[in-house]
Amino acid sequence: MKLLLVLLTIASVALAAVDDVAVNNFKVGILAKDQQPSDENLKTVALFSKLPNELKADASQRLYVSFTVAKKSDNAKVKPHQVFLRFVAQNGEDVVVVVNPDANGNYVYDNVLRTAAKSFRNLSGQFKISLLVGDVTIKNPINWQFANIDAALPVAYEPTPKSQQVHFEPLNEISHIFRQPEKRPSALISDLFTIICLSPLLILVVLWSQVGINFQNAPASPWVPIFHVGLIGIFGIYFMFWVQFDMFVTLKYLAVLGFLTFVAGNRVLRAISESKQKSE
């Protein structure tokens, strides 16, 4: 089945490729940006002939080329698969652009040279312009140089990478905005909070003054002064936490001093209990 399809394709191509083609109504010219094409500003060129004078254009002008492709046998218009304009620079580099037909089968290339320069890879100066026409059904492919053009195309410079750019100019002044201090409460609220925090100690001092402190029943033990010194030290740690220490430093000192005060207090209570048992 595949072999049959291949043979049918070859046969159809062989039968189709029986006609020669010709390029008719070939016109070329340089137009201004908003100028309409007409017989006055376009030159007609016969197939396989060449314009005697060189075309000259700058980047603001348009290159206009129009033509039709028809069979020689019946002059019917055809649309070959490959229709190109080829621009060959003096250094041998070439640029090939596609020419597409309109709905009526007419081929038109109309482009501002500044826009076309993007595809010319920074080429500028003199070019040889050729028309290329080809198709599997065409017996005589066309490669026709019909004109020379001197085009002053703009050179598209490649941008310098940002890492390689050097700017000799003063830099903007760096201004640092410091964080605004947080709004603190009024002095009245601060004093009231301090009094509330110190109120348990004040109440303790008042109650001690009313009840009285009896040092006569204190046992003769070295743990007694250690216990009282530990209590005073704990109050001192609280005070330092208030003015300087953070929570972690406070807990570190409080763990050591609190354990020592706890042991000393336990020993004092045991000594008091033993002295009471002896007195009874």
Swiss-Prot record:
Highest taxon of the lineage: Eukaryota
Annotated compartments: Endoplasmic reticulum membrane
Pathway(s): Protein modification; protein glycosylation
Keywords of this entry: Endoplasmic reticulum, Membrane, Signal, Transmembrane, Transmembrane helix
Sequence intervals crossing the membrane: 188-208, 223-243, 245-265
InterPro entries: Ribophorin_II_3rd (IPR055374), Ribophorin_II_C (IPR056790), Swp1 (IPR008814)
Main location: endoplasmic reticulum
One cellular component term from this protein's GO annotations in UniProt: oligosaccharyltransferase complex
GO biological process entries: endoplasmic reticulum organization; protein N-linked glycosylation; regulation of cell division
Topology Lumenal: residue spans: 17-187, 244
Residues exposed to the Cytoplasmic side: 209-222, 266-280
Signal peptide residues on this chain, from the entry's feature table: 1-16
Positions in coiled-coil regions: none
Deletion consequences: RNAi-mediated knock-down is mostly embryonic lethal. Embryogenesis proceeds more slowly and embryos are osmo-sensitive. Twenty-five percent of embryos exhibit cytokinesis defects. Sixty-five percent of embryos have incorrectly positioned cleavage furrows. Other phenotypes include delayed chromosome alignment at metaphase and disrupted endoplasmic reticulum morphology.
Topology in membrane: Multi-pass membrane protein
Functional summary from the UniProt entry: Subunit of the oligosaccharyl transferase (OST) complex that catalyzes the initial transfer of a defined glycan (Glc(3)Man(9)GlcNAc(2) in eukaryotes) from the lipid carrier dolichol-pyrophosphate to an asparagine residue within an Asn-X-Ser/Thr consensus motif in nascent polypeptide chains, the first step in protein N-glycosylation. N-glycosylation occurs cotranslationally and the complex associates with the Sec61 complex at the channel-forming translocon complex that mediates protein translocation across the endoplasmic reticulum (ER). All subunits are required for a maximal enzyme activity.
Family statement: Belongs to the SWP1 family.
Subunit structure: Component of the oligosaccharyltransferase (OST) complex.
Protein name: Dolichyl-diphosphooligosaccharide--protein glycosyltransferase subunit 2
Originating species: Caenorhabditis elegans
Lineage: Eukaryota, Metazoa, Ecdysozoa, Nematoda, Chromadorea
Gene: ostd-1
